[in-house]
Amino acid sequence: MDKREEKTREAIVEAYLALSMEKRGSKITISEVASRANIARKTFYLHYESLEDVSQDASRRKLDDLILILERHRFFKNPFDTDLLFHCLNQLIEPDIDLYRYLSKENPELFFWSQLKRTMIRLITEIYKSQIDMPAPELRLYAEYFISGVTAVYISWLREEIPLPFEKLASLVGEATLHGIRKPQSGDSAETSA
């Protein structure tokens, strides 16, 4: 794909996301997206077959951005680092937090989150399969449990169902990942057992 085609696709995606925020639940048409992207309707069809295709492309683009952020922060050296995953997610989402809040309230499975879960589970499983002595189905279960839990909590926070500051949320999810529901007591540290 040449730069001009990529620029047109990017304009279509941006127009689609902007209209999603503005219209909040009202039907968006291809004509509206084309007009907002400053292209002809027939140009839209040169790049996408439907608005669903645009939504999936937008999700893929955001996921690609997240993977770059995760790589930059070396997340894949320790892919079960909840705190780092939360901070990387937030780095991606913060600039467009109103859009993500809206989309997470409407139908979180339609945009980004389901692709995120599938991709992260696949990546974690691939990365760890040669590093951990664990049968592949068990490793996949751990990855699914971890990623599904993190994304569910993050979506609930975006929906403002969990009224905690971001840093506290990230910290608590990290504790839950390490200790489960049995939060360690202050006297249960390694220092007191020595």
Describe the role of every protein-language-model region.
Residues 38-48, 150:
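Short hydrophobic/aromatic patch on the recognition helix
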Residues 1-23, 27, 32, 36:
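Basic, helix-initiating cap at the start of DNA-binding domains
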Residues 29-30, 50, 165:
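Residues that mark the N-terminal boundary/hinge immediately upstream of a DNA-recognition element
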Residues 29-30, 58-67:
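Short, basic, alpha-helical segments at the C-terminal edge of helix-turn-helix-like DNA-binding modules
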Residues 148, 156-194:
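C-terminal peripheral helix-coil segments that are non-catalytic and often amphipathic
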Residues 70-98:
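Hydrophobic alpha-helical connector segments
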Residues 107-132, 137-148, 182:
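Amphipathic alpha-helical packing segments from all-alpha helical-bundle domains
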